[in-house]
Every structure is written in structure tokens, then in C-alpha cells.
Amino acid sequence: MMKLMLFSIIVILFSLIGSIHGADVPGNYPLDSSDDTYLCAPLGENPSCIQICRKHGVKYGYCYAFQCWCEYLEDKNVKI
């Protein structure tokens, strides 16, 4: 019983540490000249999304929810 309690406490502590130091990377969905997002497939790392994100001035992006997502894309650079 004591081992289970200790294990539970350790799991909770690691969960809290992970949520405090989470790796949420800011970003935005880039927009084309018609204010539409760029559609994409397959999900995940996607060469066309990376290319689109580079046009918007950031180094990396990927396909998320069938739309290109650019990491570190600021609001002012969303539309080209």
C-alpha cells in the first residue's frame, strides 16, 4: 500500500512539473490573400506547410486539423 501511495505521489509531481514547464510553442494559422487558411493533408509534418510558413517568415510549420500551422508566426505576419 505504501509503495502505491509513493508511486502516486511521484506521478502527480511529474505531471505538475510537466504542466508548469510545458513546451507549448506559440504560433498561428497563416492566411492567404483572401483571408483563408491553407488547407493541407496528410496531418503532421508536411512539406507544403513548411514551404508556406517560410513564405510567411518562419522556419517551421505542420499540418494540424487539416490546416497549416506555423510555429512562432506572429499576428502581424499572418497574412501575405
UniProtKB/Swiss-Prot annotation:
Signal peptide residue numbers: 1-22
Protein name: Beta-toxin KAaH2
Disulfide partners: C40-C63, C49-C68, C53-C70
Residues spanning the membrane: none
Organism: Androctonus australis
SUPFAM superfamilies reported in the protein's UniProt record: Scorpion toxin-like
Top-rank taxon, per record: Eukaryota
Chief place where the protein resides: secreted
One Pfam short name: Toxin_3
Keyword Repeat: no
InterPro entries documented for this protein: LCN-type_CS_alpha_beta_dom (IPR044062), Scorpion_toxin-like_sf (IPR036574), Scorpion_toxinL/defensin (IPR002061)
Keywords, alphabetical: Disulfide bond, Ion channel impairing toxin, Neurotoxin, Potassium channel impairing toxin, Secreted, Signal, Toxin, Voltage-gated potassium channel impairing toxin
Tissues of expression: Expressed by the venom gland.
Family: Belongs to the long (3 C-C) scorpion toxin superfamily. Sodium/Potassium channel inhibitor family.
Comment on protein domains: Has the structural arrangement of an alpha-helix connected to antiparallel beta-sheets by disulfide bonds (CS-alpha/beta).
Functional note: Weakly inhibits the vertebrate potassium channel Kv1.1/KCNA1.
Subcellular location: Secreted
Domain LCN-type CS-alpha/beta: 25-80
Single GO MF descriptor: ion channel inhibitor activity
Miscellaneous information on this protein: Negative results: does not inhibit the vertebrate potassium channel Kv1.3/KCNA3. This toxin is a weak beta toxin because it has no effect on Nav1.2a/SCN2A voltage-dependent sodium channels when perfused at a concentration of 100 nM, but when added to the extracellular bath solution at a concentration of 1 uM it shifts the voltage of activation toward more negative potentials. Has no effect on the Nav1.5/SCN5A voltage-dependent sodium channel. Administration to mice produces no toxic effects.
GO-annotated cellular components: extracellular region
